[in-house]
């Protein structure tokens, strides 16, 4: 309950942001949407759950909310930008860089967003990425619960 209460406001704001960004892409920038809106929404929900759970895990190691926010930015920004496929395609990454690309949720969501927007993909093709995001959510939430129990003891 405690973790869900901390996560819910971020979840709501992030899903609203996703809807606004999709609308802007479609109507302001004229990017055609060819795939499944439900798949993009589902992938977006899983991505937000995974990333907010990662934030909860990082906050378990800090004393203040500001420290948690800064820590999350420092720990996730560079790997997300460099290895998610945002700048360099993940298919061209090798070795440790390729591993880093799979260890953060952003790359998996980027595959979902690009797949639904430009390649007309739906859940039948994007289920591995959705499963990975769900795995991140379960893993980060599970570790957060373990850390919370250790703090209470």
What do the PLM-derived regions correspond to, one by one?
Residues 1-17, 132:
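Alpha-helical transmembrane segments of multi-pass membrane proteins
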Residues 19-28:
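Short membrane-interface helical motifs at transmembrane helix boundaries
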Residues 12, 22, 32-153:
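Membrane-spanning alpha-helical segments of multipass transporters and channels
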């Amino acid at each position: 309950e405690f973790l869900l209460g901390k996560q819910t406001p971020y979840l709501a704001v992030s899903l609203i942001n996703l809807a606004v960004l999709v609308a802007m892409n479609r109507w302001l920038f004229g990017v055609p949407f060819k795939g499944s809106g439900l798949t993009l929404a589902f992938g977006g929900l899983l991505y937000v759950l995974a990333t907010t759970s990662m934030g909860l895990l990082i906050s378990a190691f800090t004393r203040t909310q500001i420290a948690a926010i800064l820590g999350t930015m420092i720990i996730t920004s560079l790997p997300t930008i460099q290895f998610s496929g945002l700048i360099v395609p993940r298919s061209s990454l090798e070795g440790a860089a390729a591993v880093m690309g799979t260890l953060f949720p952003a790359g998996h969501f980027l595959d979902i967003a690009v797949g639904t927007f430009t390649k007309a993909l739906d859940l039948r093709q994007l289920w591995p990425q959705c499963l990975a995001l769900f795995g991140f959510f379960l893993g980060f939430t599970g570790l957060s619960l373990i850390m919370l129990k250790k703090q209470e003891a």
